[in-house]
Structure formats: structure tokens, C-alpha cells
Amino acid sequence: MEFSVKSGNPEKQRSACIVVGVFEPRRLSGVAEQLDKVSDGYLSNLLRRGDLEGKSGQVLLLHHVPNILAERVLLVGCGKERELDERQYRQIIARTMNTLNETGSMEAVCFLSELHVKGRDTYWKVRQAVESARATLYNFNELKSKKEEPRRPLRKLVFNVPSRKELALGEQAVQHALAVATGMDICRNVANMPPNICTPRYLADQAKLMADNYDNLTVATVEEAEMEKLGMNAYLAVGRGSEHESVLTLMHYKGAADDQAPIVLVGKGLTFDSGGISIKPSANMDEMKYDMGGAAGVLGAMQALAELQLPINVIGTVAGCENMPDGKAYRPGDILTTMSGQTVEVLNTDAEGRLVLCDTLTYIERFEPESVIDLATLTGACVIALGSHASAVLSQHNPLAHEILNAAQQSGDKAWRMPLWDEYQSMLDSPFADMANIGGREAGTITAACFLSRYTKKYNWAHMDIAGTAWQGGKDKGSTGRPVPLLTQFLINRCNTEAAE
């Protein structure tokens, strides 16, 4: 599928189909009015007749419109003009994409990128349009014996920009969008794999396959034997009950000078989380294959980064592990000595992600990072607090937190900051160890971040809890590809800031 931008008049487009908007109630958009004028009122007559109201998501396909060079004109309902927001814009693009494939058109020119979305420029509208269009094409059927490919004749989609001056901006938007979309596909493919295939070793292998395509991306692994020497006892304890060995995968992307301190992305990679001895209820336990959503997000972000060849140093860290009950599994009541030397009393083996992450966060101190962001499907409490719309951001470093929130706002990959105040730290007190691995029923997302904060004193750090956003359940069960758009935007912004300085 090819995406591009151009600037031109709608009536002069020699295309299989051109796409224009209609607002509610029965009001042509500016571009549609141009077509109406050239076609001697053909479109406005249709609207007066009641063929299309203009409600969001309505479509009307027209053939042989008078004086128009295109074979077809697709009218797309956009709702009330003043109420057109970002979410509705993306939904309109997705509806358009599905309709175009139903029409049989092999190529089309879309003028919906000229719609007014409050506070958004041409770059944003083109980028979101391409990302939304690509998302409609995603289909995970690798493991089906009979692969029924959906009918998708559309091969080329061109988005029109208002003026030739904005072509460069539009082209950059397409480039960024395609990199993000490819990263999201990687994230979704890995996360959707079943846990009998997607093991900690599989995550490492996927990183190595990615590195084969880029000269400035290299991969190393930390195996269990080395973890033992390093004293990563918390990480090792979580994986002891599994047949599959734990693997910490390090992806080194070199886009800048060696002396530039790297940004480190850390992804929780629990390829299956049964809960261990504190076993989870059976209902929806199959979805615990998505407990490696943070690791999948890191893989996706590294793919987008490498595709864009951004001038920045980044280390993607994939903390692969599996939490299973077994005679060798760790138990409630165990006290673990972490790599940092701090001790942890295990009160619940289902609070395992923080144990894997705490040793990983200590390990990466050796890279002297400029900033660290960890991503984890860490707490059910986050889903209760924020639902499935926003990822949680927790940090004691305000500038980094603000950067992440800005990237969320720009990319449309929403996030919300939660407090990380010292008052919550005492909830982790243990009579037998330096801390417990859970803090009780209240403020679960915050106390989990408090736990991690004790291992991040040597660098600027932020934690993202993506438990509600990494995947969706139900009939449309599957990975969402988040937070790849947010992370990619964060890295783009970092490069832009450094270039400006």
C-alpha cells in the first residue's frame, strides 16, 4: 500500500476515486463545493434530494459526475463541522479506507486532510490519516490453517494538502506515519503471538531479526548464568517456575556520537503471567499473554526509530520472563536480594513485573542514560483508574513527565500523569525486609511505581503503566500497538530539540 501527498484542484484529478467531505446537515465542505460548482450543482442537488445527511460515517459513492475527470466521487459524512474532533477525524478516515476497498478502486485522492480539526495543522492531519488508514489494513492470521485475505484492491492513496508550500510538511508526515505504523505492526504481531511461541527467547530472536536490517542497530542478550553472577535475584526468582529461561535483550541503536548519553526504553516482557503460586482466576487468563505489552512496545518503537534513522542514541531493553507455578517457583513469604542490594519480601507472586523491572533498572545504570522510560502492563489498578483510553505516567522528574505528556498530546496516543508522592512510600513497608512487593489494595498503580522509584536514583526516570491500553479484550481481542506512537513522537521531539540547540 503506497501513500503520498499532492496539491491540486479536485476537479482536475484523473483518479479512480476522489474523496470529499459533507457536513451535517447536508452541507458541502469547501472542496466539495468546488466540485459542485464545476458539475453544475450535481452534488448539492443530491443533498437536497436527501441522498446524504452528512452524519459522521455516512458514505455515498457517485459514478460519472459531470465535468469531473475522476471515475468516482466518494462523499463522506463528517458530522457537524464545529464538532469535528481528533477522534472523529480518525474514525472518518478509517471508514473511508474500508469503503474505498469495497468500491474496487485501485487508487484514490483524498481531500479529507483539508478538513478543519481544531488546533491541528496539515502535518498532524496527514500523519493521523496515514496511521489510521494503515491500522485498518492490519490482520493477524498467521496461525490460521485457512487464510481468508480480505478484499483490498486499493494500492495507492494520495492525500491532498491545501498549498504547494505544505508539500514538504505533508511528505514528512507520511514518512513519520509509515514508520510509526510499521512499528505498531511489529508490536501487534509480537504481542498477538501465543505464549507457546512467544517465549523470552522469541523476543530476543525478534530483536535480532530487526537488527539484521539496520547497520546501526545491534543486539546483545543477558542470559540466566550472567544474571546469577550479577545478583539479579529478583528477576531470576520470577522465572524459576518456567520451562523457558529468562532472557534480557539489549538493542543498541547508534544514531549520534558515542559521547551522547542514550535514552533507555525498558519493556516488561512477561510472555505469560499465570500469577505463579498466587495464581490468577481462570477467566480471561488467556489474555495474560499480553503481559509482555511493554516489551512489544519497545520493539515497535525501536523499529520506528531505525526506520526514521533519527540522530539519537537509544537502548531498547526487553526484559523477557515467564511467571509459572512449579516446585521451583518463588513463594509468598520469600525474601529476595535484588541486584541493588535492597531486599524485598514477596507477599504476592502475581506482583512479579516490578521484580523483573527493578533488577533491569539497576542493570542499565552502566549505560549512564540521559533518561529512562519503562513501559509495563503493571497493575489492574491502572485499568480501574483510567480505563482503556489513557496510559498512566508517573515520574519524580517534571521535565521528563511533561515531555511524555506533550508527545502523547501530539501523537493522539493519550496519557495521564498520576502522583508519585513520598506519602505513598510507607505503604510498601515490611517488618522483615527493606520493602514488600505490594502495598495493599489502595493506590495500586502508585505504590507499584513507588517500588520502582527505589531503583532509579541515578538517572531521570519515568514509568508508564499501559495495562489498560496495550490490548483490548472481547470479540476484537488483540494488541493495540500502543504506546509506539507516543514513544516515537517523544524521540522525534528529542531530536528536534537538540537540533534547535
Swiss-Prot record:
Binds 2 manganese ions per subunit. The active site is at K280, R354. GO terms for cellular component: cytoplasm. InterPro entries: Leucine_aapep/pepB (IPR011356), Macro_dom-like (IPR043472), Peptidase_M17_C (IPR000819), Peptidase_M17_leu_NH2_pept (IPR023042), Peptidase_M17_N (IPR008283). Pfam families: Peptidase_M17, Peptidase_M17_N. GO terms for molecular function: manganese ion binding; metalloaminopeptidase activity. It catalyses: Release of an N-terminal amino acid, Xaa-|-Yaa-, in which Xaa is preferably Leu, but may be other amino acids including Pro although not Arg or Lys, and Yaa may be Pro. Amino acid amides and methyl esters are also readily hydrolyzed, but rates on arylamides are exceedingly low; Release of an N-terminal amino acid, preferentially leucine, but not glutamic or aspartic acids. GO terms for biological process: proteolysis. Mn(2+) 2 binds at K268, D273, D291, E352. Mn(2+) 1 binds at D273, D350, E352. It is found in: Cytoplasm. NCBIfam families: PRK00913.1-1, PRK00913.1-2, PRK00913.1-4. Presumably involved in the processing and regular turnover of intracellular proteins. Catalyzes the removal of unsubstituted N-terminal amino acids from various peptides. Belongs to the peptidase M17 family. This is Probable cytosol aminopeptidase.
